[in-house]
Every structure is written in structure tokens, then in C-alpha cells.
Amino acid sequence: MKDCAQPLQHIEHGIPPVFDERSEALVLGTMPSPKSREAAFFYGHPQNRFWRVLAALFDEPVPEDNAERADLLLRHHIALWDVLESCDIRGASDASIANPHPNDLSRVLEKAPVRRVFCTGAAAGRYYARLCEAASGLPADVLPSPSPANAAWSLPRLVEAYRPVAEAVTPFKPPVLEVPRVVALERAIAEAGTPLDVLMRRAGRFLAFEARKALEGMEGAKEIVIFCGNGNNGGDGWVAGEYLDRWGIPVRVVTAKAPEELTAEPARAAALQAAASLGERSQVVLAPSNAEVTALLDGAPLAIDALLGTGFAHDTVKAPFDGWIRVLNVAHDQGTLVVAADVPSGLSAQTGRAAKDAVRADLTVTMIVPKPGLAAKDGAAHCGRVVVAPIAYIEPLV
């Protein structure tokens, strides 16, 4: 009764479509809700499950802001908009819509190779069929609404219902790039609007995401030991620790230097933020001995190696990292799962040559693109399974 008592309000859309010349699937809602208009982006209500569904479809973390949401769409060749350009509506109630006027979908369809159209809910499907289908020439698949009001559909059911969206697009396969080209690519990403500190947060979150998945099904304590170096690879580890702690997984962050002693940026800022945010069950372990590291790893189900990154190209590893690597490898042989950030420490990401002391990982989460050393020479023996973390939309840049 309360909703019916509200007057109809005339709403103009105002949010531009997300697409580019690579978009192959067009996903359409009906009209932005008040929360979406407030957020100036699609599906802005915090309880709306649209972004959780897409993240689950592509096995990646849920995007946290509008830039990440647009990035996810473009990386997966998905265009996103709404059927209506304006209407009279009561709150967020599609059932109350009057005087609907459609968006000009040719803005998308004339520039992007869209092959399939999807509508997120029955109302969007009805308005598309009535107002847009004749002009577009493309019928729409009507998907269940991801709105929290559609409580009959659980998140797993929604993910399966939306799977045709993932099947309608061509996956992008990132190229193998030599380390100097990766450095240049990171600069190009920054110049395109995603600075290095943002990339680091995305990298650390993806690392934490993969570590949390690896813990699933393990029995016993869910505690993770994270080895953080002094550079930006270590920064990824600090961010991972921050997220894991936030998700309720205690971490022990092993570091040779306190966060305030670090000089590399954005690693220093990331470490300071992470250290300040850790809860009571987590801790920072500063400059431990090999014996103390052994005790930390005793019974630990999983460890993250974020000591040395893609810039390493030496025959030996300096102390104390060499000793920590030896202890970590012993723990690995005794059953601790090891996840490496970008490249196992002590392995050259360029040549695949391993130093005297090099981490043996079960999983390597490499950032942005694969590097040649992950598969060359000693690479396969040290990397384990390799997952590429798609932390930026790079297709126009490579």
C-alpha cells in the first residue's frame, strides 16, 4: 500500500551505455533504480546480485566500484544498458511504469558486433519486444531478475540461468609478454586511467580470492602465512592479507621490514593500510629467524609467496629470503599448499631459470598476462598450475 501511495515520477535515464567495438552480447535492464541513479551506474543497489552473478560466471572477485564493473564488462565483451530512455515510475517498481520511451540501441548495435541480446527480467523483456526488437532485428533471451525482490532465485540458480551470457562471447586469451613489455603495458594501463596503486589492490584481491578458493574443502585451521618482500610483489601480498583478514581468514604476514621502513611505492602505502586494518586474530611477524618461520608454517594449510617479483634475474637469493624459501619448500613437501604471487620467488619470469633457492609453488597467480619464464626451463617445475589474474582491460593495448 505504501508503494501504491507514492506518486509517479518522471525519470530520464542519464547513464551512458558500457560497450566498445569488441562487445558481442548486449545485456539490458528496464530502467535504473533510485540506488543505481544515485551510484551513477547499473545495478547499484548493494543487494542486487547482478555483479555477483557475473563475477561467479567468470570466476573472479566481485568488482568493488564502477570502474571495475565497466572493466569486467569490457574484458568479457559484454555491453550493458537499459531498454528505456525515460518513463514515469513509482520508486523502483517496474510494474508501475507508464509512458515508456526506449533508448536508441543503435548507439550500441551500429558500433559493436552484438550477436545476442539478454534482458534481465520479465519487464525488460516485454518492453524490449514491444519497443526495440523490430528495429534491432535481434530477439532477446529473457533472464530472471537479479533484484533482491526476486528471492525465489538463489545466487547459484541465477548463475546457471545467466550462463548463456558467458557462452555468447569470445574469451580473450592474453598473450605471453616478455618482462620489459609487461612493464611498458603497466605504464600504458596507468596512462589509460588505472594507476599502479589500483592495479596492486586488484592484484592482491585476486591473489586472496584464489587462496580462499584453495582453502575450501581443507580440514583444520584456516590460517594463511604470507611472505611479503620489500617491493611491489610484496605489496600484492600485503593487500591479499588485508582481504583475507576481512573475509575472516587469519593471516600471519612475514616481512623483513616494517611497513614504514619500505620505500617502494605503491607497496609502502599498501603495507601501511593492510597492517593498520588487520584484526586481532592476524599478526605481522617482523624479521623472524628460520626456526621461527618453521614454527609459523607448522600445520599451516596454505602459504602465499610474495617475496620476489618479475624483476628478479639472479643466480642466488639474498638473506633472509633465501632461508625463508628453503623453509617454505620443506613445508611444501610436508603438505602446505603454496600460492605464488606473479612468479615463484627465485625464478626468472623472463628466462625460466631458477636460482639456487627458488619457491616450489602449487599455484602461481600471475598478473595481467603470462610471462615466458613461467613455462620455460625450470618454470613448469616451480609454478604448478598458472592462473592469469585479469586485473585490467588490456585488449586495446596489446
Regions found by a protein language model. Name each.
Residues R75-R126:
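Internal catalytic-core helix/loop-beta-alpha segment
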Residues V117, P139-R157, N232-G235, F312-A313, ...:
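Phosphate/ribose-phosphate-bearing ligand recognition and processing surfaces
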